[in-house]
Swiss-Prot record:
GO terms for cellular component: cytosol. It comes from the Bacteria. Belongs to the TACO1 family. This is Probable transcriptional regulatory protein FTN_1028. It comes from Francisella tularensis subsp. novicida (strain U112).
Length: 248
């Protein structure tokens, strides 16, 4: 299991997301709508929808907004008929990147994604070119200061696959993606509120970068995340706290 702390990345990511709150909500609503369309509107029988709702609530989305998105998707609204597309490529320094999109026009989306890679010193790859480096899993991250022993006991009892405590005191709880929402709910019920919780593609081996390359990779990820059709971007870059502080 990878032992890299998510804490520095989370703080950096949250600062960026605060400035893009409207766009983040649009992406979350789209994920809820598509999850409901594909798997039905009952979150108890639809793990993907349950995870999408949990992420939306963690981002302070209102329950009314969430419910409207579920109804729209489950009702088969034609505007919800977008398809999911995944692109893979390499960024500066050979960093592996996965880009998950939802689109009603593949040609538009691939053109925009390719342009972002090319303008940032990377290149779009073929299907499978980097996906083998990643494992899909749930990661629930806690800030330094949480009661490690108590958290470990509750998490393992709830079915967590692994728990990693990092040098900075932060803790990551790893789950099977299908058990993610259930484990998160148990932790919340027991009083353990995470700083971040998501089903993600986690790289077993991280790419170590210097400050200049890290800044270029961050710029590429920002460009990709700003594209309307892009839902999520994953990379194997190891953005350490030291690197983030150097970049500012």
């Amino acid at each position: 299991m990878a032992g890299h702390s998510k804490w520095a990345n989370i703080k950096h990511k949250k600062a960026k997301e605060d400035a893009k709150r409207g766009k983040i909500f649009t992406k979350l609503i789209r994920e809820i709508t598509v999850a409901a369309r594909l798997g039905g509107g009952d979150k108890d029988a639809n793990p993907r929808l349950r995870a999408a709702i949990a992420t939306a609530l963690a981002n302070n989305m209102s329950k009314d907004t969430i419910e409207r998105a579920v109804v729209k998707g489950a009702g088969g609204d034609e505007s919800a008929n977008v398809e999911e597309v995944r692109y893979e490529g390499y960024g500066p320094g050979g960093v592996a990147i996965i880009v998950d999109c939802m689109t009603d026009n593949r040609n538009r989306t691939v053109g925009e994604v390719r342009h972002a890679f090319t303008k940032s010193g990377g290149n779009l790859g073929t299907d499978g070119s980097v996906a083998y480096m990643f494992t899909k899993r749930g990661i629930i991250s806690f800030a330094p200061g949480v009661d490690e022993d108590a958290l470990m006991e509750v998490a393992l009892e709830a079915g967590a696959e692994d728990i990693i405590t990092h040098e900075d005191g932060s803790i990551d709880v790893y789950t099977d993606p299908y058990d993610f929402s259930d484990i998160q709910e148990v932790l919340i019920e027991k009083g353990f509120n995470s700083e971040n919780a998501e089903v993600t593609f986690d790289a077993e081996t991280k790419a170590e970068l210097d400050a200049e390359t890290a800044e270029k990779v961050m710029a590429l990820i920002d460009k990709l995340e700003d594209l309307d059709d892009v839902q999520s971007v994953y990379s194997n870059a190891n953005f350490t706290q030291e690197l983030i502080e150097q970049i500012g």
